[in-house]
């Protein structure tokens, strides 16, 4: 039963990361001033 909890935890974390990446890309597309520096770094990270 403990292993099942770990699987759920990993899936939730991965889902959050994917969602965060989507939001990040939207912000970069809109060219928000605050995110411009982070977006430059973000281009080097393969999502």
Curated annotation (Swiss-Prot):
Disulfide bonds: none annotated. Changing residue 39 to A: No longer represses PhoP-regulated transcription. The chain crosses the membrane at residues 6-26. InterPro entries: MgrB (IPR020907). Its main location: membrane. GO terms for biological process: cellular response to magnesium ion; negative regulation of phosphorelay signal transduction system; response to acidic pH. May form homooligomers. Probably interacts with the periplasmic domain of PhoQ. NCBIfam families: PRK10299.1 (NF007635). This is PhoP/PhoQ regulator MgrB. It comes from Escherichia coli (strain K12). The lineage of its organism: Bacteria, Pseudomonadati, Pseudomonadota, Gammaproteobacteria, Enterobacterales.
